Amino acid sequence: MHILSDTMDQHQEHIPKSTNMTHLDEELTQLKSEITTMWLMVISQLHKTRQSLVEFDKDLAREVVATEKRINSLELKIDRDCENIFALFNPVAVDLRTVLAILKINNNLERSGDIAEGIAKYTITAHLPFDQDLVDTTSILEMYDETNAILEDVLKAFENDDTKLARSIFKRDELVDEINNKANIAVADYIRSHPDRIEDGLYIISMIRKLERVGDHCKNIAEEIIFNIEAKVLKHKSKKKKEE
């Protein structure tokens, strides 16, 4: 937990401070701080589910489940804070886009937190450590690493108003999709040759599908970052258009 606290402190340095800030500016700064805290919690949750999978650490997996309640509480607080800003300040232009973007980012992060909790529950209910051959052939650890790297990079894009980095997410998610597609074949082959380890196969493929959904949420977040900075709505646009 100390590591997460230190990381949060480092990220708070990216949030601008000014002696001439208006009340709305102060509220937006606080809102960005809260969403950053939630972001780092979700990243930590995914790291822990990876570790609990590798080490078959049920206690760590239970810690992930317990922490999800804190993420849910923070999501509700951010929602309320956004509603208060709408009601009290009637923001316009870039301020309005910032609040709208954070509101949607908040939802995507909360869902990613739910996914981490769901993955942790597979480790909790599994009867045996996961077969290393299955872990290797499905590339689930590589998928974990890429998903977490994408989640960390969309945070950097948010903190630095970096639309180029945000746009790179659309291309990088292809690796996550590719692993997901290949894993279906790998798991089917594994179950056929290891009929006594069907549970392993079903749990691993379920984890991979959940990680693929985190990648989708990261793409949604990248769209909101671009909307916030450039006032461009990318929803329903083709991948080629999003990358332009």
Model-predicted regions and their roles:
Residues 2-244:
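Cytosolic, long alpha-helical scaffolding segments
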